């Protein structure tokens, strides 16, 4: 049947590639429009793999003293940020892994990072406070102390940041420095997810 043409199957899983990093993988994500897959391990190692083949592109060891805690990749996929037990956040280039800027948040662990959907802001949670920096590392906003350690952060829309801690979820307007809403809950909140429109927690 000469009219049959080969095609690339879509909409189903196919065997791809596997790879191993130096320690327990704690964070990962796609960069450079799917051309690169970055994995971070608990010891502070970072590994960039070629998206199609799994071939290692670059790797870095001991990026954070005491270990890596979080990683987030910018929506445009050109830069990423990592944090660790050393109280520092590193903003790095995805192409080669080189550090562009280091933010020093003090002695506390920096446990959560999240770029805003438009990529203009980076939210950083350390202990009971949340800070927001722009993409070149300038501080734009900082919260007051939460009642307990911040357990999760996410952006609900362009300028609104949601945080979770013991007993509540809070929505902050970071541009106008005000609290939009507090949702009280009797108990420990260890994670948080919002619906795509930001209306459901």
Question: What is the predicted role of each segment?
Answer:
Residues 51-53, 94-97, 134-138, 174-177:
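Short loop/turn segments that connect beta-strands within beta-propeller blades
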Residues 32-33, 75-76, 117-118, 156-158, ...:
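Residue-level detector of Asp-centered blade-edge/turn motifs that repeat once per structural unit
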Residues 2-23:
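A short helix->beta-strand "capping" segment at the edge of beta-propeller domains
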Residues 18-25, 61-68, 104-110, 144-150, ...:
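WD40/WD-repeat beta-propeller blade N-cap
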Residues 18-44:
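Beta-strand-rich domains and repeat architectures in extracellular enzymes and scaffolds
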Residues 43-47, 86-90, 108, 128-131, ...:
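Short coil/turn segments within WD40 beta-propeller repeats
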